[in-house]
Regions:
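Cysteine-nucleophile active-site neighborhood
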Residues: 94-165
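Amide-donor transfer/coupling interface in amidating biosynthetic enzymes
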Residues: 1-63, 78, 82-84, 88, ...
Length: 296
């Protein structure tokens, strides 16, 4: 709690929460990122910027052990899917994972995560899949393949809402042009998605491609970018890869005057807040039943 307050994240205590005459929204995060505490903070910062009460739980996989997060932290804040499968949640976020170089079926937790993908359809009102999870969800649910890129998609890219979809609540308050961080070696392609009548590409970029894909009236939202990234996340990835001697270009449109010493120019923060607050309000809060056990 103190860490969240130090990050200027709005938190209320139980007594104040209980005095408010609303049911908290139950949100579960399946956190597959290596630096779990960083990802938790990034997501909670966005989820907390809402007048709604949010109760966040963290899920972990039984078939995968985190190497970069203290075991004490995992025991204190994370639960296995098996212990949560009888519960229902208003919303779920499934994060990216550093396994995109593998075929989906070769990921060591593929069996468990696809069981979770199936579970979301009967136990969660709306699920947001991010980056690798978006590709994995599109592949598992709809057969959409991923493709290896010649060069890593790395930087901040200009996006727009696809023609005909500006009325969607997910885009309320968005500018005509908005910016999103990307950090990935693979992509899904518009031509494959367009062949599936259940899917809609609702935002995209001329440079980085497909951005948001929606299905089932917003019960499934697939996001290829990382709007949740904090200002220095791409900087950390860039310097990490440089330190390892890996081939990596400087992130595009990221540093002031393309100079790493001048730090990043943040152009995606307002869009990130709108994306998550619109999702929480219009696709979770407005759609979920008051009796959470009625979620089907």
């Amino acid at each position: 709690i103190n860490l969240l307050k130090e990050e200027n994240i709005f938190v209320i205590d139980n007594s104040r929460a209980n005095a408010q005459d609303i049911r908290p929204l139950k949100i579960v995060v399946l956190n597959l990122m290596p630096l779990k505490i960083t990802t938790e903070t990034d997501l909670i910062r966005l989820l907390s910027n809402s007048p709604l009460q949010i109760e966040v739980s963290f899920m972990k996989l039984k078939s995968h052990t985190s190497k970069n997060t203290p075991i004490e932290h995992m025991k204190a804040f994370y639960r296995d899917f098996a212990s949560m499968r009888e519960e229902r949640f208003d919303g779920m976020i499934i994060t990216g994972a550093p396994v995109e170089h593998l075929e989906f079926e070769d990921v060591n937790y593929w069996s468990e995560i696809t069981e979770i993908f199936d579970w979301t359809r009967t136990h969660v009102t709306s699920t947001m899949y991010i980056c690798w999870a978006a590709q994995a969800g599109l592949y598992y649910h709809y057969g959409i393949p991923k493709y290896q890129l010649d060069k890593k998609m790395f930087g901040i890219f200009e996006h727009h809402v696809t023609e005909g979809f500006s009325h969607l609540p997910i885009f309320r308050g968005f500018d005509d042009v908005f910016y999103v961080p990307h950090s990935r070696h693979t992509e899904v392609r518009r031509e494959d998605i367009d062949k599936c009548k259940e899917l809609q590409v609702v935002s995209e970029s001329d440079e980085s491609g497909v951005h948001i894909v929606m299905a089932r009236g917003g019960r499934e939202i697939f996001v290829t970018g990382h709007s949740e990234y904090s200002p220095y996340t791409l900087d950390g990835e860039y310097r990490r890869d440089l330190g390892k001697g890996l081939p990596i270009d400087m992130p595009k449109n990221y540093y002031r005057n393309d100079d790493p010493e001048q730090g990043p120019l943040v152009r995606w923060r307002s869009t990130a807040n709108l994306l998550f607050s619109n999702w929480l309000n219009y696709y979770v809060y407005q759609e979920t039943p008051y009796d959470i056990n009625q979620i089907r």
